[in-house]
Each structure stands twice: as C-alpha cells, then as structure tokens.
Amino acid sequence: MTLNLYDTLSRRIVTLDCRDRVELYVCGPTVQSPPHIGHMRSGVVYDCLRRWLEYKGLPVLYVRNITDIDDKILASARSTETGETWWQIAYRVSGLFNEAYKALFVKPPDYEPLVTAHIPDIIKAIEILIQKNVAYRAMDGSGNVFFSIDKHPSYGELTDQKDLLIDDCITPGKRDPRDFTLWKEKKDTDPDLAFWESPWGPGRPGWHIECSVMATKYLGTRFAIHGGGVDLRFPHHENELAQARALGAHFADIWMHTGAVNVEGIKMSKSFGNSVLVQDALSKVSPSALRYYFLTAHYRSTLNYTENSLSQACNTWNKLQGCIYRVYDYLEREGYENDFCVSQLNTDFSTSLDNDLNIPEALAIVHNKVREMNRLVDTQADMQYLGNTLSEVVEMLSILCPIDHKITYTSGAQDNSKALLQVLLEARDRARSKGDFYTSDLLRELLAEADISVSDGHVSYGSPRG
C-alpha cells in the first residue's frame, strides 16, 4: 500500500511508512467560543484521511485533543453576561464542537484528551526539560518557566522561522526574547480553579507543551502523522516539535497542515468580525452539502468562502445525491434487489487519494460516475452494471462525503415526497394570492433545486444531474 502526503517538515511529498497501524494526532480546538467553518474544514479533511486509511485496511489510532484551559477561555468567562465559569464555558463549547463534528459525519477520535486531565504529566515533562537545561525558571523570580531556544540548536526546523510573536517576546523574566512559556504563574486576576500547584508555584501550563505531552502519551515517542491547520505551524507546532525533541522523542514522521479559510477574499478572523459559525452555515445548507463544500478545494489550498460558492456547492451536491436516490428507486421499481458489489474501487479514484489526498480530483471521478448512471437509467441499459456502478459511487462517497441512508428514495418516500410537494405548491399559491412574492419566489427556487419547475400553475419534473 502506498500513500504519498506532503510533509511540512521536509517540504516535499513523502510516502507514509505503513506499519501495523497509523497513528494520527490532530490539534483540536481551544474551546472558548462556538466552532467556525475553519475548525470544521480541518476536522473533515482528517476524517477523510482516516476513512481512506481504514478503507485500505490500515487500523488508525486517532487522537484529537481539547484545550480546555487557556487565556482565551478565561477572557470569555470574564466577559460573559451569563455568569458562566471558565470550566462551564469549556464544557459547553466542547459539546458544541462534538455536535458539529457529528452533524458533518466526522467520526469521533479514539481518544480526546483534555488538558486539565493531564496537568501532572505536563509538570513532569517540564521538570525533565529543566533537568536537561533546555528550560529554566524566570529570571525575575516569578513562577513562570520558559523553554530556552538557544539551548535547542535545531529550533526552527519545521517552518524555518525562529522569531516568536511580539506578544510572546515581551514577557518579563526571559533570558532571550524568543524563549516561550512552558508554565504560567498564577495571576491575581485568575479565577478559582484556574491554576494548579507545581514546583514553581501555582499556575497553569503554556499552550505548546500540552500537545507535546498528550501526543506522546497516547501515541508514543514516534508516530505517523501530526495534523492541524496552517495557522498552527508557527509558533505552536514549531514549539511542539522542539519540546518533544528535547524530551528525547522523534515525534511525527509526517506533518500535515490544512489550508486557511478566507471569507469573500479576506482572511477569516475574529478581529475582522467575519468569522462564519458552523451553525450559521448549517442554517443555509445541509450538513452533507457543507461537508462537500469543504472538499471542493485541495486540503492544502485556501478555501475562499462566499455565499455564492456555498450555494453552488449545495446545488451540485443535491443533484449528485438526487441521482443516487433516482437510481435506487429505478432499480427497486425494476425488481432488482440491492445485492450489487464493488470488487475494486475505480483505479483513478484510488490514485487521486494516494496522491497527497487529492479529494477534488477524486470527486471529479465520482461526478463522472454519476453522469454515467443517469445515462444508464435514461437508456434502460444493463441493470447489473448500473447497480454495481451505484454501489461503487456509494462506496467512494462513504470515504469522502457519506450519503445519509436515513433518506432513501423508495416508493414510500416518493409518496411522502408527493405530499410534501403538494404542501409547498399550496404554500406558494397562498403567498402569491397575498402578494407575498418574496416567499413565492423563494419556494419556487427551492423547488427548482429539486429539478421541479413551476410556471403559471404548471409543474414539470427534471432528472437530477451530477
């Protein structure tokens, strides 16, 4: 089995070393606010990677952490008007993330460790780094502990970048402005339960050490893949790697990074006020359509979110899914049982995914198959071949964008669809009679998305096309 992936560390395409299993660690969310589409795009990409590996017969041990203690979470608690504590916010928002993952068909990780459950492990790791003289207690006598970049000559190997962010550099007590925090001393403004006792006094861990510790605890000192968003490359992943190497770990063989999400050509950021929450996106399109949208750009490319591109992707997905339901219904009406099989996935499909997880290219192959199925139904061609093609398409989508099998295009479903259609048509007529042309046009557009044309009281049906 060969799977080639782009490795950020070596800056080239490398072949995954497929041992008995593939270990995958992905940096999860800091749970201070509800999930946005950038979080979910990353989650969907790594879910596709996991599904593809498992389809190829490789067991995957998948770990995705949750950062449930952080300055941002504490700031959210201070600014909230509901009186929620920081840990209540972390618990609630963690639930929102898991609901979003579930809605988008992202399989849960094997382990989802919380930072707050691993404080003793983190303290032990910091003690080892101090013993190795690559970390030190703050020079100003405070309880802060820093990692010494000067003591780790290979620092910067992941991104070829050595200068830290300005906010990190101004912390007092450092030997070198570039050194970064391993342990943060408790502040007078910190709320109750937001600190732990340590050899350096009460405080909490720095962000970067958390992932180094949890990744090696669950996956060992050497594992296959470390993933995350491109925004985490520096300083987070650079610091993670430095800490792990200083602790004696090889760490990840391959570093993967998903591209950023822009909104109307501008980087999505809270500071710009243009973050698109998952719940808002899901108010416009179905979960499967949103997942499909995330996959229309290569995982390393920037995805430019626009209302128009989301709508187009939704229409494309609805037509694709509509074709599948159409074929299911056609085969059932022709008396064919669903006993078709897939002996081997399309070679080009497999090659695309093996080539740095080229999902857009793989989706193009799915669309070609969908067009072929429509032609086979229209010409009433070989039913066995049609059924096998349908099974192959469903199999391919089970890796990329699973079909919701709770929605089936059976005869009973057709009856329900007719009843629903009648309700929509009557609602449109009522809106027109009241002069509510906005609602009337909206209902007509919704019907058009299902290939149902309404004009002057006449209704016509088209065949869904992929």
Curated annotation (Swiss-Prot):
InterPro entries according to UniProt: Cys-tRNA-ligase, Cys-tRNA-synt_Ia_DALR, Cys-tRNA/MSH_ligase, Rossmann-like_a/b/a_fold, tRNA-synt_1_cat_dom, tRNAsynth_Ia_anticodon-bd
Matches recorded under Pfam families: DALR_2 (PF09190), tRNA-synt_1e (PF01406)
Record key words, sorted: Aminoacyl-tRNA synthetase, ATP-binding, Cytoplasm, Ligase, Metal-binding, Nucleotide-binding, Protein biosynthesis, Zinc
Chain residues that bind ATP: 270
Top class in the EC scheme: ligase
Gene3D superfamilies: Cysteine-tRNA ligase, C-terminal anti-codon recognition domain (1.20.120.1910), HUPs (3.40.50.620)
An example Gene Ontology molecular-function term: zinc ion binding
EC number(s) recorded for this UniProt protein: 6.1.1.16
Cofactor notes: Binds 1 zinc ion per subunit.
A GO term from the CC aspect: cytosol
A single BP term in Gene Ontology: cysteinyl-tRNA aminoacylation
Catalysed reaction equations from the record: tRNA(Cys) + L-cysteine + ATP = L-cysteinyl-tRNA(Cys) + AMP + diphosphate
Motif ('HIGH' region): 29-39
Needed co-factor(s): Zn(2+)
Motif ('KMSKS' region): 267-271
Principal location: cytoplasm
Residue sites binding Zn(2+) per the record: 27, 211, 236, 240
Protein location: Cytoplasm
Subunit structure of this chain's protein: Monomer.
NCBIfam families to which the protein is assigned, alphabetical: cysS
Similarity-based family: Belongs to the class-I aminoacyl-tRNA synthetase family.
Protein name: Cysteine--tRNA ligase 1
The species this protein was found in: Tropheryma whipplei (strain Twist)
Designated gene of the protein: cysS1
